[in-house]
């Protein structure tokens, strides 16, 4: 007989190496074959629901790490809630309309001019659906579970119909109206442009300083004072209606050779230099805050028009005078601030960039040519203080490479002002993980202007608006609902396939159309209105979901995006927020915190991580991040994540190997009869479980990541599993001491696998499939471990022991360095009380100390002589163990004997081997 044959060594088919890139797809195929998503729902049918509503990613392009971070975080939550017994359906969605898809088709060589609008839209739809299939495959490869066979898609007829109904209800409440707003306009293309169609090039522009006389001082400034503005677009001066100052900036009234000028104090030196003022002749006469200057009235330099002094937070001290020329018809900030003061929107420029009749003496001039005419007139009026030329970065049309302008054109708006307070109240009633999230969306809603919902494109949901012969707008409940019904049946392409009269209810008449002819709106809706309608198109429409959702979770850019548009349309139509709880995550940066870009060569994409390391590594990385802020990823970070994964995997494998001959139904030891050390570990498991459950509840995955490592390293690897080898391998198979440990080991393995399951979805499933006697076919169909009250007194006692054990380990390390011993089993440890700790009394209640310390002999005495080393928990002496080494267990003994041909066996091993002979 060989010694090895008498040992109970670990046995498991669970491989040491993960091989995740190859193994994970096999596990996923099994899940799909078993329809695990619906099985999990069926298991919890009738239970309390939890709805995490998916914000739809855009259906264009490959997934980036931000997509992975987002979907994996959502998967953590939904899987955890499912394992807690909630009915938690997860319906992924896609946003499919908008300019990028139009651009993508153009890049692919699709010539829009050679086909009808309806045909072009059909190609857009085909492209979007192709992109969805690609992204869907990649999301599933990350281990994300959801109803991917029936996702929601914003181009589906039923979704578009729901969106139209929201529009109609808002229109019914007077929240939809038509007005003018400045947009990027390309005179060379004669069309409006989206930001994505803008590129920046250097341009030489006039730089002018202009004086505006005070007309009504409001008792604040001197009546003969002048405001100085600076602009690089002289052609917009005819559209000036205001001067904007920052409410919190300090402004000064400066006397310069008898002239009184008002500018920001922080810019006074720069202005003096630009205008060649003699510094000796400059005198600061008065000081104001921008707030105090509000509502002072200035006079337009050459038109019979007032220019109101107003407040705006967009004013900076980076350049200029701190007094900003404001023309709401030609600037985004100007328009937004102008809305607050109900300023007129003047934009006397036509589609070709030429001044209209409204431009007065500049009529017929191309805007760029008008620059000289305007500066000449300002000089004539004595208002031009300085003309110069600068070269600066300026927006150009990406197609024609020609400069663009801001030009006010008719647009459709959703009124924010009428529902702003209701939205703010809804935000107050919404829960947030962090207060700054609430502050962020609250301030955005509080400060935002009206919502421009129209776009001059073709790939989107048409605005369901008609016009009578006399130009009157037709947007009634009857007409809008009829369009919604048509879209539900045929899709929105019908708008581009039929005449206006065929889109109106049968027999529809209107006093503005005596001849019965109508036209239809050509603009489409902003894509944020599309995705912002998902609470109606998805939550209220799908039977397994419900409104409002329990949770929305997206990137922090969605405070101004989807979070904002969703709560706006929901409050406007339903009076409540569409989400009860809001959570956001940061962006994914490289290892140094820099933005990823191809030019820097620092881009890491999900596909690369999955193919090289596996989805579970990507998921473990997500759990390791403080996702509320921006997170970092690099090859080095992923290597560290892989190292942590390896440690987790090997620990689970060790436990699997050592419960291979254990049946919990027949071999378990009742808790009251467990060895105390096993009861300690059982209570530590309960403590770890309670903490992990609490962290899942609070979405604190970084805590889980850290505590899993701590539990594995400190409690298991450094102590329990190391201590356990002498029992699991050496003791008799059915001995009480071995079964006691296996009882707890099995519990740790099962509970840890469950607790890790939402994060390491594939590995947990693999462990489960190798765990004997588990009841559920999949760990993902099991329930989370229950939180059980711990025996605090026992934990406190053993924590003290573990501190004492640390002292013993330190003493062993010293003895090893001094060549007193080699391995710890060569040691004999003597422990005595000292002034700091009564070790001899404390240790009386502990059995098998030599096993707990992993040494051969332990002696506890009241006192030791001066040769002992004093530690926090007693005086300790390390000597070489007495006797000789047992050839089977490697413990030292003075009573070695033989059984059959096996010699050098300690008494314990003699007894075990005899039972095998």
UniProtKB/Swiss-Prot annotation:
One GO cellular component term: cytosol
Organism, scientific name: Staphylococcus aureus
A GO molecular-function descriptor: aminoacyl-tRNA deacylase activity
Function of the molecule: Catalyzes the attachment of isoleucine to tRNA(Ile). As IleRS can inadvertently accommodate and process structurally similar amino acids such as valine, to avoid such errors it has two additional distinct tRNA(Ile)-dependent editing activities. One activity is designated as 'pretransfer' editing and involves the hydrolysis of activated Val-AMP. The other activity is designated 'posttransfer' editing and involves deacylation of mischarged Val-tRNA(Ile).
Main location: cytoplasm
Gene: ileS
Membership in a protein family: Belongs to the class-I aminoacyl-tRNA synthetase family. IleS type 1 subfamily.
Cofactor note as given: Binds 1 zinc ion per subunit.
EC number(s) given by UniProt: 6.1.1.5
Protein biosynthesis recorded as keyword: yes
Protein name listed in UniProt: Isoleucine--tRNA ligase
